Amino acid sequence: MDMVAHAEINNLSFVYADENEKALQHISLSVQKGEFIALAGGSGSGKTTLLKHLKKELLPIGKRTGDTYYDGTLLENVPDLLSAQEIGMVFQNPENQLVMDTVIQELAFSLENIGLPSHIIQKRIAELISFLGFQDLLHQSVHTLSGGQKQLVNLAAVLVMQPKLLLLDEPTAQLDPIAAKEFLGLLKRINEELGITIVLSEHRLDEVIPLATRVICMNNGRIVYDGSPKRVIANMWEVEGFRPFIPQIPRLFLEWNAKDIPFTVREAQMKMNDFSAISYVNEPIVQREKQEVILSAEHISFQYEKNSPLILRDLTVSIEKGKWVALVGKNGTGKSTLLTILAGLQKARRGKVKWNGKVIHKIDSKERFKSIGYVSQHPYYHFTFDTVWDEVYERARELYGEQGKEIAEQQLKKFWLYALKERHPHDCSGGEQQLLALCTTLLSKPTLLLLDEPTKGLDPWKKERVGELFRKLQKEGTTIVMATHDIEFAAKYVDQCMMLFDGAVIMNDAPKEFFSGNFFYTTSINRFIRKELPYALTWEDVYEACPNDMLHS
């Protein structure tokens, strides 16, 4: 007798209200108990829409055909209480799910809503906190937590319901590399020790693939590959358009035509036969000629309230004209705050910011708004209109008058948004919202770009195109300062990296020196082969240096 699938989708197609293009096309999928499924695919490929079709409360509004079942029951017929308890969902933005003031209130909230007695609530919270190990956070205000801690609380608030199926939509998109590793490690424990089934949508596959029992790759609302991680990665390798989605370590070994593909640093090192064969010379890094300082922060200190801790303390930094600078560091170290101060959106408690030699707050606001482009880590903060078209067209018309319509059309096509022009910005995927915010910001051709997590939510292919666009802007004289958790992107593209810690810049160097000196804040490729190739940061760096006869036969 066949086992009943934990969740099952039969020939599901879906079109959002007021749209013509199908978001999902003929999806058939069976999820077995205990699986750890990674959903991969481009921005807007249907991953989030598919996840929402596995929980009845999240079913999007539109026209659908086909059926979805949970434990053999049609999803629409699953009792509300059962759905709330057994199917949990964690979203991309840590801020969006928190509703209470303290951590313990957040954990108790959902249990109180389903009417559990207080002694059961206390027992569940105590047991869960012991499992997760964050007793110290229990009575803290959720507003004082870092992004990683907030996402941990979101996960805990779902786990306290003792779910059987856990859905996660890019849960590490806003987490620093260390917090992301900790979060994903916790998901592995939940899956292995508690037997909870996990379906996870994620662009950063480097850390997810080794955990997954199965990978599903989507494109244009369809499932194109479905199978074991090794099988799906091999299938993706056969199609040029999917190769950017393959994580760095397996990508390197596929380039080497290896038969058995490793996914982790340990597996990769075990496959290397003879490191002495490396044809590489550690030449000194060429120092670039220093340029004029265009932006400076001098002895900046900042706190949100008079008696609150300092976010930035006596921070001094100089940005040279035409440079692309990455700010990295843990959630809560002040990267976003520094960007808003550099943009003139917030004023430092002490110290001065100068742009082109002028104190930033003494520059006319209209001139500042046109010449300095700022994109928040929450792109929806930028949206004021009801359609993607209006967001871009109204700004283009304001800047260019009668030419605005033509320029808006060109800009939307440039950022792969033209097909979405009638969609409400808040109905776009996280990556599409990111592109829309960039699209409108770049209309004024700013000479200084201040970007907070610009690659968040972007699939690897679009990320490469955005990287190329920023390089082109650099060549035209644009200066870029970018806060990012995307170590691979920074390693590949930027000129300079700065690490913030305890409110100050503690490291400031070119990418090769910066990342080769780090243990955690570096790329998977560098961790794999740092002793032999200390400055290798990408698979391309290693491929150029290492012949493929170094592999075990």
UniProtKB/Swiss-Prot annotation:
Gene3D superfamilies: P-loop containing nucleotide triphosphate hydrolases. It is a peripheral membrane protein. Keywords: ATP-binding, Cell membrane, Membrane, Nucleotide-binding, Repeat, Translocase, Transport. PROSITE patterns: ABC_TRANSPORTER_1, ABC_TRANSPORTER_2. Residues 7-245, 295-527 form the ABC transporter domain. ATP 2 binds at residues 329-336. ATP 1 binds at residues 41-48. SUPFAM superfamilies: P-loop containing nucleoside triphosphate hydrolases (SSF52540). It is found in: Cell membrane. It is an enzyme of class 7 (translocase). Probably part of an ABC transporter complex. Responsible for energy coupling to the transport system. This is Putative ABC transporter ATP-binding protein BCE_3323. The lineage of its organism: Bacteria, Bacillati, Bacillota, Bacilli, Bacillales.
